Amino acid sequence: MKQEIFGIPIFHDQVDVTKFDCIPLAPLEPTWDSGVMSSFSSQKQEEIPESIWGYLSGVVERNLYSAQLMGKNARFGHIWRNVYKKHDYQDAHIHPKSQWSYVIYVDVTSRTAFFNPSIHNIQNHFGCTLPQFPLDYKPNLEPGSMIIFPSFL
């Protein structure tokens, strides 16, 4: 009998990106090692309308709550916008001190890659060629898509 253990749930959903048009555009600055343009340091959270917080809460809740993964005191921390040009990239990273994160693809298709948290052990014991032990996950998401994932990915 085969049994799967240590599964990592992620969620794909659709959002109405036109709702985000009401968010004031914060200045974009080069960030992180990649220099991708971002409002990470300049986006004032208080400028994000309550309607957006409510909309995003609803999308997250309909995914996490039905899977019994949403805590009783859930709250959003920080929202920002990254703008990618053709050859821009984002280094592998996590979102510390948070449980769940998400990416919304407003006008680009996904080039996001998630690395298996056990990648080092898998490579050490099995190499890189067993499809039963994938080393990464590259979702195929279009504009208007949202992916919700544990922040340790």
What residue ranges belong to the model's regions?
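Non-heme Fe(II)/2-oxoglutarate
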Residues: M1-K72, W80, Y89
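A generic structural micro-feature
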Residues: I5, N73, I94-S98
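Catalytic core of non-heme Fe(II) oxygenases with the double-stranded beta-helix
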Residues: R81-I148
